[in-house]
Amino acid sequence: MEGGGGSGNKTTGGLAGFFGAGGAGYSHADLAGVPLTGMNPLSPYLNVDPRYLVQDTDEFILPTGANKTRGRFELAFFTIGGCCMTVAAFGAMNGLRLGLKETQNMAWSKPRNVQILNMVTRQGALWANTLGSLALLYSAFGVIIEKTRGAEDDLNTVAAGTMTGMLYKCTGGLRGIARGGLTGLTLTSLYALYNNWEHMKGSLLQQSL
């Protein structure tokens, strides 16, 4: 019976030692002096090779609410594609309206459906081609101005819009160039004002206080 009791105690002690409760074990001080093979620990409690903590690339912590901005070249693809698809949808709706208006005296038949479909595709392509060309010119001028100045700000937006309007209306003579440049200047200035409205409002409030 004694042997059985002793065996039971040994088993209990072994399980307790395995789970970290009771029995003889190693203290934290003893473990702190054990060297880690192939490692150069920074502290006794660091069980990770410091070589894995080295970053190969630079990483920056941005302020709260700040986002990484994209350049003109990255935004050019989104601008051109978005303008083409959006205006193509509006052009298709306008073509549907015109097609229904022009064929209102015709009965619902295959010729009428074909005529309406032709009007929808024609208007959608026309509108998409027009605004797509403007978006392409605007993006190209924006990229060129950004690379030339080495900065990205609202001045690039206004300058690119003005030059786009001037080039698009260059076939209309000096009056057409002036009219197109003024239109581009006005639209891009309003866009820049809209983007900076909150900042301008905060600045005015600080000055008033």
UniProtKB/Swiss-Prot annotation:
One of its GO terms (molecular function) is protein transmembrane transporter activity. Pfam families: Tim17 (PF02466). One of its GO terms (cellular component) is TIM23 mitochondrial import inner membrane translocase complex. It is a multi-pass membrane protein. It comes from the Eukaryota. It is found in: Mitochondrion inner membrane. The chain crosses the membrane at residues 73-93, 125-145, 172-194. GO terms for biological process: protein import into mitochondrial matrix; type 2 mitophagy. Keywords: Membrane, Mitochondrion, Mitochondrion inner membrane, Protein transport, Translocation, Transmembrane, Transmembrane helix, Transport. Essential component of the TIM23 complex, a complex that mediates the translocation of transit peptide-containing proteins across the mitochondrial inner membrane. Has a role in the activation of stress-induced mitophagy by protecting PINK1 from OMA1-mediated degradation and facilitating its accumulation at the outer mitochondrial membrane in response to depolarization. Belongs to the Tim17/Tim22/Tim23 family. Component of the TIM23 complex at least composed of TIMM23, TIMM17 (TIMM17A or TIMM17B) and TIMM50; within this complex, directly interacts with TIMM50. The complex interacts with the TIMM44 component of the PAM complex and with DNAJC15. Upon mitochondrial depolarization, interacts with PINK1; the interaction is required for PINK1 accumulation at the outer mitochondrial membrane, kinase activation by autophosphorylation and PRKN recruitement to mitochondria. This is Mitochondrial import inner membrane translocase subunit Tim23. It comes from Pongo abelii.
